[in-house]
């Protein structure tokens, strides 16, 4: 039976990737359907109750800059906010919010309900409607068929998901939810290259059984930062502290004694886990020289009786989990409310995707989130936004869009996946971005909001606020450039008292701001009239631009140099066997990845500068350059 309505875009899965995908498609005007197993779990935080962090916060800001929901939901649900790396340079500073799970889920549901052009339907998807090599809709478990121009799969850990606790295991998409076994089988039958990954979660603990007095308190920042460029502190719920404790040698002895019943160390689990978020048993084995590991004790919510012990993800048997938890300071009398577990699931080789996140093997089918081998809410949400946008554009026969590595962390994320692939869950870090000085959290709106507006993602309210901010930045910069100080003036004496190098020539306040020992607060103290009506975000942008102008200019010059490679397009049908001089290994890699540009080809592991030179010679000789 076919559903009455047809859609431009169908999104399968209501997690962080799915919600952003559905919202992005609908914001551009596409008739969008979001299909989920359970509408009550839309936007659910399946693992840790937090948004942001190093590299991840940058993605959240970029999602927000393009009209996405994640940052606004974090502002409405955040019960502790911190700026990580606050003492370091602006490129690596990152916002992190501890979130109330219930409030976050509520904010996501309200955002979905308020979105025009978006419908919700609760059913498990078991099959795709395929016409030739094109996706044309989906089929649900009760045989209901939905037709659409494009389909976006954002199915998280549900594809053939299997949950492990000790040597016991069972099918599941996450604790309490069934897996998507039929859909996983169908995708395998369609010829997609599949492998297995695993992730895990720690046991939850009854907060009433925890002695917080034996732990170190970790309060949030004051004043609290906001996540969204449109956010305000007034939106934040009451703020609370987290706590820190540590494992000890007794903890490690218990873990080592239980390894003979660990699914990881007995070969039961075959999937590869996240390198940068390993289980506690993995940490104890890999870092045997360490006598303790830090645990962040995080509240699950203002009204929740559960806490999340971040740092002891485990799939050990329950009796070992309980002994391990009670060996930790502050947890001596702890009661576990839910055991930790590991989950194995299918993912598909992201090198089989285009930069738009459309699959190469099947037209009109897009993948986003953990199905592509990533880990983390933020990585999933960013992919969801891109896939939803491009599915909507494909449905209307428009060209796809994606950001470059020099434009957004989202561009770095997608290019890494498409070009390099991954054999382990991929997590974003600032170190993955070669142009991180220009890809800061603080300027995500300046980088992406204008593009988002052109793509139909940014509404009038956000655009108006952005234009006002951009104008204020230009105004303040012009004011500082116009106000000048002569070395023989009375003002120069007060400036010389602030700096190690006396003023030798006439200089503008903007030039003075470039000095490392002069801050904007010094200038504001001497010329407060210049700062009337200028908020903190505007002042911050002007100061960063002044302080780092030389570094930014050099990075921009490097970006322009590299862009020349990106301008050389490579046809998808290119026969690399005809490129004279390439080794068989290089030909195989180029044929496997099928890079879209010479720049992407240069980033494929094992492709040498000599091979790129041969490729350029071939392009010029054949008239393709």
Swiss-Prot record:
Which is a GO BP term held by this UniProt record?
tRNA wobble uridine modification
Q: Which PROSITE patterns match?
A: GIDA_1 (PS01280), GIDA_2 (PS01281)
Task: Report the GO terms under cellular component.
Answer: cytosol
Where does it live in the cell?
Cytoplasm
Annotated binding of NAD(+), by residue? 273-287
GO MF terms here are: flavin adenine dinucleotide binding
Q: Which Gene3D superfamilies match?
A: FAD/NAD(P)-binding domain (3.50.50.60), GidA associated domain, C-terminal subdomain (1.10.150.570), tRNA uridine 5-carboxymethylaminomethyl modification enzyme MnmG/GidA (1.10.10.1800)
Which keywords label this protein? Cytoplasm, FAD, Flavoprotein, NAD, tRNA processing
Q: Which domain of life is it from?
A: Bacteria
Q: Which cofactor does it need?
A: FAD
Q: Sorted alphabetically, which InterPro entries does this protein's record hold?
A: FAD/NAD-bd_sf, GIDA_C_N, MnmG, MnmG-rel, MnmG-rel_CS, MnmG_C, MnmG_C_subdom, MnmG_C_subdom_sf
Q: Family, per the entry?
A: Belongs to the MnmG family.
Its biological purpose: NAD-binding protein involved in the addition of a carboxymethylaminomethyl (cmnm) group at the wobble position (U34) of certain tRNAs, forming tRNA-cmnm(5)s(2)U34.
Q: What is this protein called?
A: tRNA uridine 5-carboxymethylaminomethyl modification enzyme MnmG
Q: Which organism is it from?
A: Methylococcus capsulatus (strain ATCC 33009 / NCIMB 11132 / Bath)
Question: Which lineage is the organism of this entry classified under, starting from the top rank?
Answer: Bacteria, Pseudomonadati, Pseudomonadota, Gammaproteobacteria, Methylococcales
Name of encoding gene: mnmG
């Amino acid at each position: 039976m076919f559903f009455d309505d047809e859609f431009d875009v169908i999104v399968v899965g209501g997690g962080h990737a799915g919600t952003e995908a559905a919202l992005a498609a609908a914001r551009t005007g596409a008739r969008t359907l979001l299909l989920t197993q359970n509408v009550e779990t839309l936007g659910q935080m399946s693992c840790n109750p937090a948004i942001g962090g190093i590299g991840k916060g940058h993605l959240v800001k970029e999602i927000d800059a393009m009209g996405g929901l994640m940052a606004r939901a974090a502002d409405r649900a955040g019960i502790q906010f911190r700026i990580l790396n606050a003492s370091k340079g602006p490129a690596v500073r990152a916002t992190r919010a501890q979130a109330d799970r219930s409030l976050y889920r509520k904010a996501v549901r309200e955002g979905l309900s308020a979105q025009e052009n978006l419908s919700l339907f609760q059913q498990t998807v078991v099959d795709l409607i395929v016409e030739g090599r094109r996706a044309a809709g989906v089929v649900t478990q009760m045989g209901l068929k939905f037709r659409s121009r494009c389909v976006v799969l954002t199915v998280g850990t549900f594809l053939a998901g299997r949950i492990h606790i000790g040597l016991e295991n069972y099918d599941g998409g996450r604790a309490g939810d069934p897996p998507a076994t039929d859909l996983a089988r169908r995708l395998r039958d369609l010829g997609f290259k599949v492998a297995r990954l695993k992730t895990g979660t720690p046991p939850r603990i009854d907060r009433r059984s925890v002695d917080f007095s034996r732990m170190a308190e970790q309060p949030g920042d004051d004043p609290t930062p906001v996540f969204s460029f449109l956010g305000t502190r007034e939106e934040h719920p009451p703020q609370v502290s987290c706590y820190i404790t540590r494992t000890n040698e007794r903890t490690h002895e218990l873990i080592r004694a239980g390894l003979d019943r660990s699914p990881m160390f007995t070969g039961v689990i075959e999937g590869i886990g996240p390198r940068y978020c390993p289980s506690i048993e993995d940490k104890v084995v890999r870092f045997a020289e360490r006598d303790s590991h830090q645990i962040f004790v995080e509240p699950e919510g203002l009204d929740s009786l559960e806490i999340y012990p971040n740092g002891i993800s485990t799939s050990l048997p329950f009796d070992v989990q309980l002994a391990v938890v009670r060996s930790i300071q502050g947890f001596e009398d702890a009661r576990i409310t839910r055991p930790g577990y590991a989950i194995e699931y299918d993912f598909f080789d992201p090198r089989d995707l285009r930069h738009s996140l459309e699959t190469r093997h099947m037209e009109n089918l897009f993948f986003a989130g953990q199905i592509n081998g990533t880990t983390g809410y933020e990585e999933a949400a960013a992919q969801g936004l891109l896939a939803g946008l491009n599915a909507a554009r494909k449905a209307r026969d428009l060209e796809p869009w994606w950001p470059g590595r020099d434009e957004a962390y989202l561009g770095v994320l997608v290019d890494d996946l498409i070009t390099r692939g991954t054999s382990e869950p991929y997590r974003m870090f600032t170190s993955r971005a070669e142009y991180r000085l220009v890809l800061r959290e603080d300027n995500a709106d300046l980088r992406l909001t204008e593009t988002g507006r052109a793509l139909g993602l940014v509404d009038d309210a956000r655009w108006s606020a952005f234009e006002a901010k951009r104008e204020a930045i230009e105004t303040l910069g012009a004011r500082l450039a116009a106000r000048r100080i002569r070395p023989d003036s009375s003002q120069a004496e007060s400036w010389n008292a602030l700096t190690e190098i006396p003023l030798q020539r006439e200089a503008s306040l903007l030039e003075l701001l470039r000095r490392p020992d002069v801050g904007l607060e010094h200038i504001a103290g001497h010329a407060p009239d210049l700062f009337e009506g200028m908020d903190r975000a505007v002042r911050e942008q002007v100061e960063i631009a002044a302080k780092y102008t030389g570094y930014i200019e050099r990075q921009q010059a490097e970006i322009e140099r590299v862009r020349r490679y990106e301008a050389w397009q490579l046809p998808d049908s290119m026969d690399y066997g005809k490129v004279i001089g390439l080794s068989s290994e290089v030909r195989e890699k180029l044929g496997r990845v099928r890079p879209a540009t010479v720049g992407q080809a240069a980033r494929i592991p094992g492709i040498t500068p000599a091979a790129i030179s041969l490729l350029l010679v071939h392009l010029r000789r054949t008239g393709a350059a």
